[in-house]
């Protein structure tokens, strides 16, 4: 297992040349992101806020993204017990930063309101508030709701990853194990979210990406024997020589992992079979999981030079993890997801 560089002091994320000053990982947003420091074309800058809330029976995902040449605002509702999901997205041409997403996840508001839909992610009274509405979300049915996120852990996964191309980077924070409460109305159905059962993750991303990428990402949040617990795992893009994004969350603290491998089954022709059991292993032997899928939120889009092929697979993990102090904890039927996404963007 190779050594990973932990960032421990606050400093600007980017130098005068637009490159990362200090690649590595951190436990909070120590590197300071300023959009004005980026030297790339506004067409190439990608900024997004993504929230996922679930109790393992239903799920809600909300996205506001400004990808330079294209804005993407998306709502997903997933019903794992009934084995269906609905994702409806609205695209905006050439936002070029006009969405004005905050330069930190710790303050500010991410908001969008267009014909037939609106979303707002903001801070109020020490909590994160998510409000959303979309007409004709599923057929003629609208969706709307308000969700409050609390109990944010002391530490989060933060990583500054360079690409080998100058001026290209990805700055990312994952805040797992937040508790969620609120309500969702979809058509004539109402779903109550209670903080003893629902957990949330924030995927906060800012950067300049190269054109063609494939990434693997997995995440889970919940409780293990009454202790807030989860993980973030992933790889596939950028130069990760300084650090990986693989961590365990336990009791509000991070336990750093080495490299994690996603073993997705394939058929005799080499095509991936996403709904068959997966296996996850790590080079430090601290993360071993068998994954049983229950629902594949798949999406494919190809338009000219733009392509997105997504498989976000939800299911249950069984295996074991090892904390920094050597404590081995068994994990059984722990709900989360793992995905493979290819983008040309």
Can you say where each PLM-predicted feature lies in the sequence?
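Structured soluble/peripheral alpha/beta segments that form catalytic or ligand/cofactor-binding pockets
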Residues: 1-345
């Amino acid at each position: 297992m190779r050594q990973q560089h932990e960032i421990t002091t606050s400093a600007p994320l980017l130098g005068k040349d637009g490159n990362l000053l200090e690649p590595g990982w951190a436990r909070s947003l120590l590197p300071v992101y300023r959009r004005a420091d980026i030297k790339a074309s506004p067409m190439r800058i990608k900024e997004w806020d993504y929230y996922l809330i679930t109790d393992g029976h239903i799920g809600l995902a909300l996205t506001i993204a400004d990808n330079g040449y294209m804005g993407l605002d998306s709502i997903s509702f997933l019903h794992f017990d009934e084995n269906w999901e609905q994702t409806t997205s609205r695209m905006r041409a050439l936002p070029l930063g006009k969405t004005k997403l905050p330069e930190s996840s710790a303050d500010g508001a991410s908001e969008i309101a267009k014909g037939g839909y609106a979303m707002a992610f903001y801070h109020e009274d020490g909590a994160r508030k998510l409000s959303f509405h979309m007409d004709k979300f599923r057929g003629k049915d609208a969706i709307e709701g308000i969700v409050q996120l609390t109990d944010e852990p002391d530490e989060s996964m933060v990583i500054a990853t360079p690409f080998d191309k100058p001026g290209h980077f990805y700055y990312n924070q994952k805040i797992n194990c937040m508790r969620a409460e609120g309500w969702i109305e979809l058509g004539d159905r109402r779903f109550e979210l209670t903080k003893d059962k629902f957990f949330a993750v924030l995927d906060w991303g800012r950067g300049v990406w190269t054109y063609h990428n494939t990434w693997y990402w997995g995440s889970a949040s919940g409780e293990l024997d009454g202790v807030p617990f989860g993980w973030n795992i992933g790889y596939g893009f950028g130069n990760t020589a300084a650090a990986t994004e693989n961590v365990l969350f336990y009791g509000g603290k991070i336990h750093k992992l080495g490299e994690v491998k996603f073993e997705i089954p394939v058929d005799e022709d080499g095509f991936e079979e996403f709904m068959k059991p997966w296996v996850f292993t790590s080079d430090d032997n601290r993360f071993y999981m068998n994954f049983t899928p229950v629902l594949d939120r798949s999406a494919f889009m190809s338009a000219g030079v733009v392509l997105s092929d997504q498989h976000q697979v939800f299911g249950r993990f069984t295996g074991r993890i090892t904390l920094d102090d050597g404590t081995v904890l068994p994990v059984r039927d722990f709900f989360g997801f793992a995905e493979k996404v290819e983008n040309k963007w």
